Amino acid sequence: MTDTPVTLSGSECNGDRPPENGQQPSSQTRKTTDADETQTYYGVEPSLQHLPAKENQEESGNSKGNVLPRGSEDEKILNENTEENLFVVHQAIQDLSLQETSAEDTVFQEGHPWKKIPLNSHNLDMSRQKERIVHQHLEQREDESAAHQATEIEWLGFQKSSQVDILHSKCDEEEEVWNEEINEEDVDECAEDEGEDEVRVIEFKRKYREGSPLKEESLAREDSPLSSPSSQPGTPDEQLVLGKKGDIARNSYSRYNTISYRKIRKGNTKQRIDEFESMMHL
């Protein structure tokens, strides 16, 4: 047997109209018989209308299968897009802040726009009067500050000059006291030096006088005829001349010793004592 497909509309299937041209019922049936023709069955073939639905289901399944592995890529793209959007937002915020600051700078430099509005004559007069009052007040303050500074400078200068004078007077007094003390010390030292010199000279003269008779006796013994029989006794004139020469020598020797002692006294005490003793033993 051969099957003949028959297509029916929805109304015909529902029984609204009877079938035309003696066609069979709405559903396609196929009657098959076995070789024994004991069993019959009806098979419904799929119509063409159901085929696109299956194809669409297969395509949708394929599309779902294709979408599943792309999830990670989509997430990456979304993350990148969010980062780009955040960067754009930050950039826009920075631009707005820069614009605001530039606008504030221009307003600060050029002044507010309401200040640039031309004023009436009455308003101008009032503003000028206010400005004059302010300028006068400022000038008065400046004058007062200048006068105050001048008085301070004068007072400070007077104080400084008085302090300087006091310091100078103190220094002069200290110098005078110092000079007086030095002069007194010098006078005392000179007096002590002179007293010591006089004492030394007196002692030296005493020693020299005590030693001079011994020297004269020794000289007389040498000049006596007993010691030198061939020698002749000197005349009194010669003895006077010898006595004068001896006095001159004594005076010069004592003077030399006093001068040298004064020179020696300026050095060390031990050194000058040793030198003086050595001079005494000459």
Swiss-Prot record:
The Gene Ontology terms for molecular function here are: actin filament binding
Q: What GO biological process terms does the UniProt entry carry, in alphabetical order?
A: actin filament organization; morphogenesis of a branching structure; regulation of cell projection organization; regulation of cell shape
Q: Which InterPro entries does this UniProt record tie to the protein? A: Ermin, Moesin_tail_sf
Q: Where is this region: Disordered?
A: 1-71, 212-246
**What is the reported tissue distribution?**
Expressed specifically by the oligodendrocytes. Highest expression seen in the spinal cord followed by brainstem, cerebellum, thalamus, and hypothalamus. In the myelin sheath, found mainly in the abaxon and the lateral few terminal loops. Its apposition to the myelinated axon, through the latter, defines an axonal subregion, termed juxtanode, at the Ranvier node-paranode junction.
Q: Which residues carry this modification: Phosphoserine?
A: 72, 212, 224, 228, 231
Basic and acidic residues bias: start-end ranges? 212-224
Under Gene3D superfamilies, the record lists: 6.10.360.10
According to its UniProt entry, the function of this protein is described as: Plays a role in cytoskeletal rearrangements during the late wrapping and/or compaction phases of myelinogenesis as well as in maintenance and stability of myelin sheath in the adult. May play an important role in late-stage oligodendroglia maturation, myelin/Ranvier node formation during CNS development, and in the maintenance and plasticity of related structures in the mature CNS.
Q: What is this protein called in UniProt?
A: Ermin
Q: Which organism is it from?
A: Rattus norvegicus
Q: What's the encoding gene here?
A: Ermn
